[in-house]
Amino acid sequence: MSAATALYLYGVTWADAARPQAGAGVHEESVEAVPYRELAGLTSAVESTKVPAKRRDLLRHAEVLGTALVHGTVLPLRFGVVFENSTTLVEDFLLPRYAELVQLLRKFEGRVELSVKAYFREEAILAEVVHANPRIARLREATRAASDTSTYPLRVELGERVAAELQERTLRDRQVLLDRLSRLAVDVQVDQEPIEHQVLGASFLVDRERVAAFDDAMNKLAQEQAPRMHFKYLGPLAPHSFVGLSAEAG
């Protein structure tokens, strides 16, 4: 791009694992490596040091890292990291952070991130709660046909009891899932603020040779829990949740 004035940085990999990616990057620019000793920054040209977080470019950022992961270990950076040129990338980041980056690449060698999200099926879990708790069943029946005004206290109690039961089941089932999956992982990061009806949101750092076993465990869980839960399972991914790498000079 003739108007390009800056370099967008996706992540860092070993120089001998870096591969060009034609037209794969943000703004459909080609991804090229900027080497420094054993390291390489994965970059593409951009017009400005500010890159808006548009959906297509967020996807391209993830896809570039995913392709790089096929060829070797990669340390991902968050979306939007831009350097003025290859010289500043080396002098302000790769050189001063060299020892740290090498250490991180060695730490994450042969490891990938797998993302698991589990959600209750709303109708199924509510039916389960009603069936398991006679008081909730009676309250539900008592408030079903009556007016809101006349049964207001009962409705409040019903809501509180259902919420408490759902919370108890969420915590219990979350631990069951974690116990089954974490034994296959090197490390786990659990989302601290799950959304409604979410049982688990977690990222697992897994050795590549154990990914197949993790896949099998996920398939078994999905089959066992199919009547009451559904899952979203992504990976292998670059280890975003575990690297925590910023682009500030060190």
Predicted regions and their residues:
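An interfacial alpha-helical scaffold signature
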Residues: 1-250
